Amino acid sequence: MAALANELPMLDTGHVYDATAYVFSAELQQPIQRTVGKQSLVELPEKGGYLYGQAEPFRLEGIVSHEGGYTQVAGYQGSDGGAITVATSVVEGLNVLDVLTADRVVAQMTSEHPVGASVPSVSFLGTRVENLRIAGQKIEIDPHLDILGPKPKGDESYFNDGGVFSRIAHQYANIKRMAGLPQWASDQFNWDPAKAQSQNQMNCSLVNGVSGAPGKSYGHVIDIPFFGKIFLAELTVKRTPVNAGPRLEPVKTEQYNYRFILQMIRVELHGGGAHGRIIFAYIDPNGTTQLPPPGTPMPLPGQTPPGKKQPQDRP
């Protein structure tokens, strides 16, 4: 079903909104070759607003199916003048090869760029997997929705926050300590803070671990013989330097744009039943606040930022 748009009253805050969400996608090589594009894809306009998309029940032969879902994205100005972005993706009744099932999967994130700040605060409230089962066995999940913690003080970068690095390092260390860790897992979960800073990317999960799973589990990853690997709540945080142009005076800290990518379930099929990749519940809520030159007073909520034209002044 096509996305439905609903215009919210937007104020000119100097913020460029950005958010994407979709319910499901798949790329299969065996036993059939089939590509399923991003279902119920919604993309938030730069000016913000609200978009909703609904996914109808879907089945691809006997390989993968779901009972429907929906997505929504929103961008608006909060009561204190900050820019708020919300993204949600929900899929219900998923089934992969009658091995992996779940009643409901929810990916949800809210980010807020406070007035005069380029680093957003983030919340994953509502994110969850309900009644996850593998071969009929109930899987208990140990969530870690606060792995990024509170917004760093003083508009400091998440990439310079010792608490963030400590929590991610602890997550990786718990995986590395597991007995019989295969080489692929040892290579993938090798935390290097210097590399994260230089490459401007951090990879972690909103799940610390699982219990009750058949096969072997390594933190948020479940490896099932004759099926494949299941990756839960993968979170990627990226930053890119802002090209602010020439400055009249030097700045103490570099300004960055931040991107937060969450995919709740990624399945890498490589067993007897099928080969390919499946993704359930993807969100990517971001946005950029264009900060004024140093020394420029910030507008109060409802005011037009300095240098911006009033609507009646625009051609």
Predicted region positions:
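Extended, solvent-exposed, non-transmembrane regions
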Residues: 1-315
